[in-house]
């Protein structure tokens, strides 16, 4: 439901991708989670991206990537510059990124028995600048270290800088309209696969460095462990996700539980949002045809009672349960031009929800 085009201009390559997937979602009466802010103009239904790549910027195999991604309610601009180094040294990538997106997981308002989340009037404008160091791969392990300066500004739905949410509670750690921090991040990933199974594990650790007294100081970690196993004609995938944060914290840094990729049957963050979380997912897929699979799934998640520790306690104010279970069935369709996923889920409040997803669908 989209279009892709590549243009070569000298040594540079321009990739243009326009995706009209949301029009298909609208035709299936799947309502968007938050109102369209521009009055429903045609551009609001377009999801697109523009990417410019130069493989040899200064004649020494330096690579420059400039990309812009537009979603229904969010936008991201990314500039990445890579210069070659010997394989035994960490590969450097200098990154400048700016994004604007609605903050739904923590400040969103659950509706329809927690099956959807609406806008809470809080949006994040995030600017980051730093460097990524990709360590040489060792066996099945890869590692990335990054250090970045981040500046997060909080905006209302009409684009004004704000210090408090709709109920008068602070939306930043500093109490002003923005937070600043220098973040040192270490990420390690493990992956191993055979014909009948696969295993994946990732661990992220973030440390806020106190360069200035008003900047955030915190330690945050997150892990994801996934195991896939073939059971006759079927394939079972199970995963466990968890994390925690200590130290300074703004509400938008909380772990949001609920939604697609977390606990299906709930809206984004509708289960809870806390300083800690634990989410378990399992899915069994069965082949129906060569390109169509059926799926049965069970998800459960909890904020481990840490919702009350988030500044302003947004989860309690919105009546989030703190834990929840979702289960259901779905279809997975694979084609040369993309993947289609439809899930029919029910949450702990017996509210039924349809999740619809399309990836890499283009002409």
Show the residue positions of the predicted features.
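Extended beta-strand-rich architecture
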Residues: 16-19, 30-36, 47, 180-330
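Gram-negative/organellar outer-membrane beta-barrel architecture
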Residues: 1-202, 228, 257-264, 269-276, ...
């Amino acid at each position: 439901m989209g279009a892709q085009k590549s243009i070569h201009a000298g040594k540079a390559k321009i990739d243009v991708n326009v995706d009209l997937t949301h029009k298909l979602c609208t035709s299936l009466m799947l309502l968007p989670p938050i109102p369209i802010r521009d009055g429903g103009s045609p551009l609001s239904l377009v999801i697109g991206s523009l990417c410019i790549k130069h493989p040899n910027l200064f004649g020494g195999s330096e690579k420059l990537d400039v990309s812009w991604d537009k979603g229904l309610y969010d936008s991201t601009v990314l500039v990445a510059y890579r210069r070659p180094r010997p394989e035994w040294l960490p590969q450097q990538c200098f990154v400048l990124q700016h994004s604007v997106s609605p903050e739904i997981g923590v400040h969103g308002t659950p509706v329809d028995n927690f099956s959807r989340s609406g806008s809470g009037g809080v949006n994040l404008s995030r600017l980051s600048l730093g460097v990524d160091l990709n360590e040489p791969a060792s066996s099945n392990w890869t590692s990335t270290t990054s250090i970045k300066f981040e500046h997060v500004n909080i905006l209302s739905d009409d684009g004004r800088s704000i210090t408090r949410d709709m109920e008068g509670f602070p939306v930043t750690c500093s109490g002003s309209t923005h937070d600043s921090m220098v973040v040192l991040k270490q990420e390690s990933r493990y992956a191993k696969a055979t014909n009948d199974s696969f295993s994946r594990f990732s661990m992220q650790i973030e440390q806020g460095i106190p360069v200035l007294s008003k900047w955030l100081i915190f330690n945050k970690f997150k892990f994801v462990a996934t195991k896939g196993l073939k059971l006759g004609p079927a394939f079972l995938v199970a995963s466990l996700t968890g994390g925690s944060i200590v130290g300074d914290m703004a509400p938008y840094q909380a772990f949001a539980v609920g939604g697609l990729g977390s606990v299906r049957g709930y809206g984004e963050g509708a289960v809870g949002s806390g300083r800690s979380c634990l989410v378990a997912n399992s899915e069994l897929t069965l082949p129906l045809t060569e390109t169509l699979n059926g799926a049965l799934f069970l998800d459960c998640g909890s904020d481990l009672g840490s919702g009350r520790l988030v500044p302003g306690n947004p989860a309690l104010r919105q009546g989030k349960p703190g834990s929840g279970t979702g289960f259901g069935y779905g279809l997975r369709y694979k084609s040369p031009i993309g993947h289609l996923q439809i899930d029919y889920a029910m949450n702990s409040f017996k509210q039924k929800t349809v999740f619809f997803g399309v990836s890499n669908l283009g002409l």
